[in-house]
Design a protein with these regions (language model features):
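C-terminal substrate-binding/catalytic lobe of Rossmann-fold NAD(P)-dependent dehydrogenases
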Residues: 138-143, 153-333
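Conserved N-terminal Rossmann-fold NAD(P) cofactor-binding segment
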Residues: 6, 31-76, 84, 311-318
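Conserved glycine-rich cofactor-binding loop
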Residues: 15
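Conserved S-adenosyl-L-methionine
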Residues: 28-34, 139-142
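N-terminal Rossmann-fold NAD(P) dinucleotide-binding loop
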Residues: 19-20
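Rossmann-like NAD(P)(H) cofactor-binding subdomain of soluble oxidoreductases
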Residues: 91-159
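Hydrophobic Val/Ile/Leu positions in short beta-strands of Rossmann-like dinucleotide-binding domains
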Residues: 11-12, 37
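Rossmann-like NAD(P)-binding element
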Residues: 55-119
Length: 333
């Protein structure tokens, strides 16, 4: 079996549904033969490892450990789903306090045990904040830490596909930017349906303005809808898409969706948010984001919401004031 790389990939939170699915997805994609599974819950972790062994994959060196030092040492790529799970009735923001502390500890462990790691994808919520905290405490470059922010865009494509009764492949370039939550900015100007600009369809009998508003609302509540339907939070979609992200960072296929990345461009500053990017072996690089005046206003509103969350974390003492971030991580200007 051919692999994208032979370097070590560590899955943090591997005993959970997301983590275990990430591990299997990475193996089936042929990313690397060297995969380390980490989770503090040792019995569940061993169970996941046993299941993967029983799959009979060829050419794999799958290891597992509940020792974070062992898990991170020599790791070149990390995907972290090791936060507290979102439960029914909770927003991503409800998880802020608990998962902020987890992200801080993780960032410090990265700095201590694998400072030469090449790329990290953080997916535990609220990912915009946990990714930011990880970046600051790890001491890595902003291009080396990304967060899962694509599911809102994939959900937009799904909702448009269902509305028009067409294959999802016929709905192109769906994009949401800003926060990964109820305050995201859902864009219409980027998308095409059967080759036709979505903006030209909205307001017609095919898609009234009221129907478009309903679709936007469904997208912003897509994660909560999965919880209501399945009785648990999403795990298949975040597992797959996050592994697509790390695959791109390894030098695999280009990542097709927006990623959560550190933005500080004069208009939006000192924040982790969903943005148009390219992810390659050289890291995550920002592209231009353009929209209608209404969309740009929505993005500014989303940014303000993220800043409020960031400032709450600062008030909690998890992060220092923005003016002191450079002391914590010299790559943050």
């Amino acid at each position: 079996m051919e692999f994208v790389t032979n370097e070590k990939l560590t899955i943090v939170g591997a005993a959970g549904m997301i983590g275990s699915n990430m591990a299997q997805t990475a193996i089936m994609m042929g990313l690397t033969p060297n995969i380390c599974l980490y989770d503090p819950y040792a019995p569940g972790l061993e169970g996941v490892a046993e299941e993967l062994y029983h799959c009979g994959f060829e050419g794999m060196n799958i290891t597992f450990t509940s020792d974070i030092k062992e898990a991170l040492t020599d790791a070149k790529y990390i995907v972290n789903s090791g936060g507290a799970a979102r439960k029914a009735g909770m927003t991503r923001e409800d998880l802020l306090k608990r998962n902020a502390a987890i992200a801080e500890e993780f960032g410090k462990n990265v700095k201590a045990y694998c400072p030469d790691v090449k790329h990290i994808v953080v997916i535990f919520n609220p990912a915009d904040i946990t990714g930011l905290i990880t970046l600051l405490y790890s001491g890595l470059k902003p291009s080396q830490v990304t967060t899962l922010a694509a599911l809102d865009s994939t959900r937009l494509r799904s909702e448009l596909s269902k509305h028009f009764g067409i294959a999802m492949d016929n709905v192109e370039n769906c994009r949401t930017y800003g926060g990964h939550g109820e305050q995201m900015a859902v864009y219409a100007s980027t998308a095409k349906v059967n080759g036709k600009a979505l903006l030209d369809i909205i307001g017609t009998d095919a898609l009234t303005k009221e129907q478009w508003t309903e679709i936007q609302q469904k997208v912003t509540k897509g994660g909560a809808n999965i919880i209501n339907l399945r009785g648990r939070s999403s795990f298949q979609s975040p597992s797959y898409v996050s592994i697509e992200m790390i695959a791109a960072a390894m030098g695999g296929k280009p990542f097709r969706w927006p990623a959560g990345t550190y933005v500080s461009n004069g208009k939006f500053d000192h924040i982790m948010m969903a943005w148009e990017t390219s992810i390659t072996k050289d890291g995550c690089h920002l592209k231009e984001v353009k929209g209608t005046p209404e969309e740009e206003a929505a993005l500014e509103k989303s940014y303000a919401h993220l800043c409020a969350l960031r400032d709450e974390v600062i008030a909690m003492g998890v992060l220092p004031p923005v003016s002191e971030w450079n002391k914590l991580n010299p790559y943050i200007k």
